[in-house]
């Protein structure tokens, strides 16, 4: 898969989200968090890290940690396919610093523009993903998708077992 650059433009009447698949479930992440989408590459494993931390990749001389969201969210394991890819995202920390991290996902689908009317609060009942990891639930083309708060998902990741 060729490297794809993602435009970082917000729309005045809404926000853009990248639609992605994890174990046949569809999620969205804010496009402004996405720095790059690349095909699956070899990941160098790191010792003594949680199972969801796959290791690191070297992206043009920068070492970036790789997290498998399927494992982090305790979703069904799926084999990598030609559509499996890595999304490089910028994670913002409470101290205003930021880190680049890479996410293994089953596939990316499209970028959609959502207005506030398209997004509803996260319900209080249990689900595959912790409620504090979700910005809201979006209605897209007749389907409901969870919009992930990547900062919450990846901030404070326990790197050691």
Residue ranges and their predicted role:
Residues 1-161:
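An acidic, low-aromatic, low-complexity terminal/linker signal
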